Amino acid sequence: MRKLLISFVTVAILSGCQTAEDGLTTSSTPTTVTGPAASAIAGDMASRLAEQIGPSATMTIKIEKDSSDFASALEAALKGWGYTVVTDGKVGRVGKDVKLVELGYSIDGVDGQVLARLSTPSIALGRAYTATAAGAVPASPLSIMQRN
């Protein structure tokens, strides 16, 4: 009888550890950021990336070719910080003192805000923005994740 009671208690406790069938859900959706908002977000994220990855004289940044306003604004912002940006996949000859850094980016809509993320093999940056017709303003602190 005692073993039966222990079995029921064990089953009751373990049943509380089960997850729902649907698993985790997110409300993140890819979104399009245009015009002044794209420029404001790209400019802010490019400046934060420049603070983290070092001087532009020793680095070439490679990003995937994209026709979105944000991609164009990000490329222009990085060039404004003095970085050489390659978008066609053809790096050409890179000097021995110049480091090639692959940069990934994403723009997602989350709860009425825009989540911008930039990532390299060594660091990832993320920040939420509130987009307006006149531009965009940061809605969260900058998130920095350094990889070893």
From Swiss-Prot:
It is found in: Cell membrane. Keywords: Cell membrane, Conjugation, Lipoprotein, Membrane, Palmitate, Plasmid, Signal. A lipid is attached at C17 (S-diacylglycerol cysteine). Residues 1-16 form the signal peptide. A lipid is attached at C17 (N-palmitoyl cysteine). It is a lipid-anchor. GO terms for cellular component: plasma membrane. The keyword Oxidoreductase does not apply. Its main location: membrane. To A.tumefaciens Ti plasmid TrbH. This is Probable conjugal transfer protein TrbH.
